[in-house]
């Protein structure tokens, strides 16, 4: 799925993908188990910001809005309902936490300061590019997804710098692991929405707090099914 989106958005920003064909990869990866599951990429210096964009109000954003009328410090119109589409997508960056810790939501101004620590003299420039690329990518991909019957409620991008210092999108892109995908059919604000992403598994875990964090096989199978359905709707291909 990342390859699909990388190919679609090359006009906005370059990506780190070199090839998904195992024949192009080192000999060790030229095995059946890696075919279709691997991507060879350029090495990047990753930027220490999680670039989150929200087109609809849901999840932690909804919880924050109910309490404060804001999401990550951004004031939103009064009277929004859960799952409402926002007037414009909002950019809500966070820091990248160490493994085991939680990412911290920060303002745009704080992202400038944070980046300046790692890239002296480039904090403002990099923060603006992260924000602008994030919004541009979301708008293009959300419009396409909607034409295929899927709402991208929110997502996360990660960017890095190549050897020349140019910004490149890396990691994965617009998969069900980093995005909320809702079916457009039956979309109705005022409550949570069914989804084609990991929220299904999360909801089961929340409903079963005494579980030992082992998902039953039927929940695993249903989650896989939702991932596949989202992929097939978006790409028109079957796996």
Regions found by a protein language model. Name each.
Residues 119-153:
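A long amphipathic alpha-helix within ATP-dependent nucleotide-binding catalytic cores
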Residues 39, 43, 131, 155:
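Short, charged/polar micro-motifs that form catalytic or ligand-binding hotspots
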Residues 67, 77-125, 169, 173-234:
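Anionic ligand-binding catalytic core segments
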Residues 1-98, 211-239:
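Active-site loop/lid in soluble adenylation, ligation, and acyl-transfer enzymes
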Residues 62-63, 164, 178-180:
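Intrinsically disordered, low-complexity acidic/polar segments
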């Amino acid at each position: 799925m990342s390859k699909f989106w990388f190919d679609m958005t090359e006009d906005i920003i370059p990506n780190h993908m070199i090839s998904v064909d195992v024949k192009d990869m080192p000999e060790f990866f030229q095995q059946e188990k890696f075919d279709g599951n691997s991507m060879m990429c350029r090495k990047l210096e990753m930027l220490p910001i999680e670039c989150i964009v929200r087109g609809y109000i849901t999840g932690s954003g909804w919880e924050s809005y109910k309490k404060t009328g804001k999401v990550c410090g951004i004031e939103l119109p009064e009277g929004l309902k859960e799952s409402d589409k926002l007037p414009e997508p909002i950019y809500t960056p966070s820091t990248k936490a160490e493994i085991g810790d939680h990412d911290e939501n920060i303002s745009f101004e704080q992202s400038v300061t944070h980046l300046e620590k790692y890239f002296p003299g480039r904090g403002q420039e990099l923060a603006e590019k992260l924000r602008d690329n994030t919004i541009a990518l979301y708008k293009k991909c959300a419009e396409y997804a909607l034409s295929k019957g899927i709402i991208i409620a929110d997502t996360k991008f990660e960017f890095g710098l190549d050897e020349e210092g140019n910004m490149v999108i890396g990691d994965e892109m617009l998969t069900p692991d980093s995005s909320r995908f809702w079916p457009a059919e039956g979309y109705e604000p005022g409550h949570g929405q069914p989804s084609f992403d990991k929220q299904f598994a999360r909801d089961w875990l929340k409903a079963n707090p005494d579980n030992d964090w082992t998902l039953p096989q039927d929940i695993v199978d249903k989650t896989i099914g939702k991932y596949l359905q989202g992929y097939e709707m978006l790409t028109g291909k079957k796996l």
